[in-house]
Amino acid sequence: MTSLTVEMITFDSADPDRLAAWWAEAVDGTVNAVAPGEFVLVLRPQGPRLGFQRVDAPTPGKNRVHVDFTAPDLDQEVDRLLSLGAVETGRQDMGGGFRWVVFADPDGNAFCVGTGGD
């Protein structure tokens, strides 16, 4: 039986250095420019690494995959991400303490930050 482990989540970007720097700040990570301008990693204390690869033509349309994060204090994290330049694009409240906020990063990649619910 094979057991898969998430090693890295990779983002396409016209400017991987800039986007990696933004995400490093957002997730308290460290930038490792493997091939500056072409491929950059963000190393994190926990969880998968984030990769940023140069792609000159972004994929048009809505993201088919996005990253979900949790935060102990959702409102505080929303304020922090907005101050870094994230753009809030939506909110959901499913009841039972399960709610999340949808954002776009500086390249327009969707990601969510939410609570785990009760």
Please give the residue ranges for each predicted region.
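Short active-site-proximal "capping" loops at secondary-structure junctions
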Residues: 38-39, 57
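Vicinal oxygen chelate
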Residues: 2-13, 32-33, 40-43, 48-53, 57-81, 99-104, ...
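Active-site-proximal flexible loops/turns
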Residues: 19, 61, 112
